[in-house]
Amino acid sequence: MSASKISALFLDIGGVLLTNGWDRTARRRAAEKFNLDLEEMNERHHLTFDTYEAGKLSLDEYLARVVFYKDRSFSRDVFKTFMFDQSQAYPDMIDLIRNLKTRYGLKVAAVNNEGRELSIHRIRTFRLDSFIDSFISSSFVHVRKPDADIYRAALDIVQAEASEVLYVDDREMFVDVAKGLGIKGIHHRSYQTTKEEMGLHGLSLGAF
């Protein structure tokens, strides 16, 4: 399938390596735990979350708009701890990427939409920097997917040709945008399907 040898992987984090950091399921749990109006919280979230993910708001500023616009019986620190605790790893995917990197000497970069504090927490907690070389997070580069400029920035930072990059994301539209730049892509649906598709691009573990 792949005419060019793959030298670099671009990876989404939420939905691929880890659970999503702060999605509708996590917000529903928060509303139940802290007795919040879920509909109002979601409306406020959607109005301001893009700004947070683009690195133009701190987490405290985001929470001031979405949760702490009125007095609460709980503290911001308690709520932030709850937010951070929603993140869980997908160990099979992490092991797959780690082993492929070792076997093929791949450059590995994360290309994801995430606020700064959540990004840093997840990188440190799950030691993502032990196998990911570069983090092109929307909050670091101030560009969000599906803006093609985030992929252009990633290519420049990693110093890779688009034809030699394989990108894995659970959002098919994001994969399609990257393909428009000549980047090969896999729409991640499960560990098994992604592993099989990577094999079609010349990346398999065999008897590793």
Task: Explain the meaning of each model-derived region.
Residues D12-G15, G55, L100, A110, ...:
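Generic structural signal for small/hydrophobic residues in well-ordered secondary structure
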Residues S2-R44, L181:
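Active-site neighborhood of HAD-like aspartate-dependent phosphohydrolases
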Residues D50-K80:
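A metal-dependent, Asp-based hydrolase signature
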Residues S4, F68, D77-A109, I120, ...:
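Short, acidic loop-to-helix structural element flanking the phosphoryl-transfer center
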Residues T25-R29, L47, E61, R65, ...:
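Alpha-helical elements of Rossmann-like donor-binding domains used by nucleotide-donor carbohydrate transfer enzymes
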Residues F34-H45, D71-T81, L203-F208:
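Short, surface-exposed acidic
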Residues S2-I6, L11, G115-F208:
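Asp-based, Mg2+/Mn2+-dependent phosphohydrolase catalytic module
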